């Protein structure tokens, strides 16, 4: 295993939202449209494309390996079933000097969640650090609440402790890193606009 930041050199290109976002020296995230752009794939030397969706069709290009992860972007979807096998596959591609593109429809939820699982397992990052790094490379990432619960469970499975937790909010359960922004979204005039975390109550 490598150290947490060894695969994340400062000379990486600036984060890209419409194109491919480089997460490590061998891992990229994108949306479905970018994943089917031959020029983007070749210019970034992608050798493996992992499609984490049921709605995006693959354009099969020669000399690229395709892996399908048929999961919908819904909190009840069991994306965690793929945490280990996909992390292992990304690592295997890197060991062969290849590069992996991980994508879903928007490059926001499903592919981001699998990226976080990979960083935890193979770069020994905490979930908090993995999220901070990935978000710095692709600012639009936002796994759904169900995927967050699965990632938190996976972090505990790997390390025996958690750096994040799910908390109650007027919008339902959310990871605690979203607590501040969710509190700011609640109208001041709403009587029930109090944000609860355990027994604590923060008034707006």
UniProtKB/Swiss-Prot annotation:
<dbReference type="GO" id="GO:0004725">
    <property type="term" value="F:protein tyrosine phosphatase activity"/>
</dbReference>
<protein>
    <recommendedName>
        <fullName>Dual specificity protein phosphatase 18</fullName>
        <ecNumber>3.1.3.16</ecNumber>
        <ecNumber>3.1.3.48</ecNumber>
    </recommendedName>
</protein>
<dbReference type="InterPro" id="IPR020420">
    <property type="entry name" value="Atypical_DUSP_subfamB"/>
</dbReference>
<feature type="region of interest" description="Sufficient for mitochondrial localization">
    <location>
        <begin position="95"/>
        <end position="141"/>
    </location>
</feature>
<dbReference type="GO" id="GO:0005743">
    <property type="term" value="C:mitochondrial inner membrane"/>
</dbReference>
<dbReference type="GO" id="GO:0035335">
    <property type="term" value="P:peptidyl-tyrosine dephosphorylation"/>
</dbReference>
<dbReference type="GO" id="GO:0005737">
    <property type="term" value="C:cytoplasm"/>
</dbReference>
<keyword id="KW-0472">Membrane</keyword>
<keyword id="KW-0378">Hydrolase</keyword>
<keyword id="KW-0963">Cytoplasm</keyword>
<dbReference type="GO" id="GO:0004722">
    <property type="term" value="F:protein serine/threonine phosphatase activity"/>
</dbReference>
<feature type="active site" description="Phosphocysteine intermediate">
    <location>
        <position position="104"/>
    </location>
</feature>
<dbReference type="GO" id="GO:0016791">
    <property type="term" value="F:phosphatase activity"/>
</dbReference>
<keyword id="KW-0999">Mitochondrion inner membrane</keyword>
<dbReference type="InterPro" id="IPR000340">
    <property type="entry name" value="Dual-sp_phosphatase_cat-dom"/>
</dbReference>
<keyword id="KW-0904">Protein phosphatase</keyword>
<dbReference type="InterPro" id="IPR000387">
    <property type="entry name" value="Tyr_Pase_dom"/>
</dbReference>
<dbReference type="InterPro" id="IPR020422">
    <property type="entry name" value="TYR_PHOSPHATASE_DUAL_dom"/>
</dbReference>
<dbReference type="InterPro" id="IPR029021">
    <property type="entry name" value="Prot-tyrosine_phosphatase-like"/>
</dbReference>
<dbReference type="GO" id="GO:0008138">
    <property type="term" value="F:protein tyrosine/serine/threonine phosphatase activity"/>
</dbReference>
<keyword id="KW-0539">Nucleus</keyword>
<dbReference type="GO" id="GO:0017017">
    <property type="term" value="F:MAP kinase tyrosine/serine/threonine phosphatase activity"/>
</dbReference>
<comment type="similarity">
    <text>Belongs to the protein-tyrosine phosphatase family. Non-receptor class dual specificity subfamily.</text>
</comment>
<dbReference type="GO" id="GO:0035970">
    <property type="term" value="P:peptidyl-threonine dephosphorylation"/>
</dbReference>
<dbReference type="InterPro" id="IPR016130">
    <property type="entry name" value="Tyr_Pase_AS"/>
</dbReference>
<dbReference type="GO" id="GO:0005634">
    <property type="term" value="C:nucleus"/>
</dbReference>
<comment type="function">
    <text>Can dephosphorylate single and diphosphorylated synthetic MAPK peptides, with preference for the phosphotyrosine and diphosphorylated forms over phosphothreonine. In vitro, dephosphorylates p-nitrophenyl phosphate (pNPP).</text>
</comment>
<feature type="domain" description="Tyrosine-protein phosphatase">
    <location>
        <begin position="19"/>
        <end position="160"/>
    </location>
</feature>
<dbReference type="Pfam" id="PF00782">
    <property type="entry name" value="DSPc"/>
</dbReference>
<keyword id="KW-0496">Mitochondrion</keyword>
<dbReference type="GO" id="GO:0016311">
    <property type="term" value="P:dephosphorylation"/>
</dbReference>
